A protein has these predicted regions:
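Long, low-complexity, charge-biased intrinsically disordered regions
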Residues: 1-200
Length: 200
């Protein structure tokens, strides 16, 4: 069973790294770690966007889990168990034009958050008529040279998701209000989007 924890204020503490210098867990503990990560991975796919980033960090240590990673896995599981009775009241926003569905995408990223490889992490959340239907926390494949570039990469991934969802909705005869709004908080990334030819 899980040791008793105070209810964590957040699901994760910070970045994890798989290091050759740190001792690895016993084979039994390694199996427990992978099973625990598998359980929380299932949750983020279906109902717990709040733990997405913490679980993404846990997956980095699947090949060699360390005591620090195991402790973080227990923290995430404690957070899930101790917040299982909490929830969000979902109340869809009725569009002014009931024939059109409203989509809003929120996109964000850190910059070079992983000190080992300097790669950034993209985060996104897609709301359909005010209800969160798609979310993701994912490490970027390339190294961004600035915070604006990291945001720009995150936006490009978010827009791919928007295009996919719009295509799915329109394939079942649901019309989407256009243009779809993408919320971003870095002016440099907004400039790059509006002037894509100058940033290529």
């Amino acid at each position: 069973g899980l040791p008793k924890y105070k209810t964590p204020g957040t699901p994760g503490l910070g970045l994890l790294k798989a290091s050759d210098e740190e001792p690895s867990l016993s084979p039994e503990k390694q199996t427990d770690y992978r099973s625990g990560v598998g359980m929380v991975l299932f949750l983020i796919k279906h109902s717990r966007p709040d733990i997405s980033n913490a679980v993404r960090e846990l997956t980095k240590c699947l090949t060699k889990a360390t005591p620090a990673a195991y402790k973080e896995m227990l923290r995430v599981m404690a957070y899930v168990l101790q917040t299982s009775t909490l929830g969000l009241k979902i109340k869809p926003i009725v569009p002014k034009d009931k024939l059109l569905w409203n989509l809003v995408m929120w996109s964000d990223s850190d910059w070079a958050g992983d000190k080992n490889d300097r790669r950034s992490v993209s985060g996104m959340g897609l709301f359909v008529c005010g209800v969160l239907v798609s979310w993701r926390s994912k490490q970027q494949k390339t190294v961004a040279l600035s915070s604006s570039e990291a945001e720009y990469i995150a936006i490009s991934e978010a827009v791919k998701e928007v295009v996919f969802v719009v295509n799915v909705l329109e394939s079942i005869k649901i019309q989407v209000e256009k243009p779809v709004v993408v919320k971003v908080d870095i002016m440099g990334a907004i400039f790059m989007c509006e002037n894509s030819t100058s940033s290529s």
